[in-house]
Amino acid sequence: MARMHELFHYLKDNKGSDLHLAAGLEPRIRVHGSLESVAGWSTLTHEALLSLLREICSEEDWADYMKCGDLDFAYGLPGVARFRANFLRQENGCGAVFRIIPEKIIPLEDLNLPKAIESLAHLQQGLVLVTGPTGSGKSTTLAAIIDKINNTYEKHIVTIEDPVEFVHKNKKSVFSQREVGEDTESFGAALRAAIRQDADVILVGEMRDLETISLAVTAAEMGALVFGTLHTNGAANTIDRLIDAFPAEEQA
């Protein structure tokens, strides 16, 4: 078993949410908000950590990481989970953080959310934003809503993410899951294409810039049901963030 796979198994078995690796430190996992050392592992040197990370990285992605010092991608370990990976370069050497993504999408009914949330899956058009800080469950909530649509309606659903997190299987709906940097140049390019691809539902992984926000609003105005995420706290802050993304002359 690859040593990275050992760490992924440990993360899942100990109900952790994130795995942190950094040169000069022992591996740690986040459990209920606190970072805990991984049992049986000692401090990782820069060279040892590079060797670990190389185990799960394609030649092309590794070349990008060596050149740019940052890399985002998703990695799947069958029977365990998928992992959202971020490689980085820092003052003391290399580092990486992995967020665990469950292999199976949790049904909306099992998330103990308000009943009103389920009604979002039955909307025909509009813009729905799921907001909150990192780790608050935005992706899990959206995956459950999209899965509800998939089980209920015959729709064309386009997801645009960086990277793709939850993998959806075609049930009643048909999916086009696109990864920024792999399947499309940018969120904006994929959104423009989705409008031309007869998309009924569009999931935007992150409303990160003016172009993405503007195109998402346009897609909703044209009849699509658009879901997206923002790192904000509360509805009022979300409205402010959306408005502030536009130039002053367009905010009125």
Predicted regions and their residues:
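Short, flexible helix-loop junctions that flank or precede catalytic/ligand sites
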Residues: 1-252
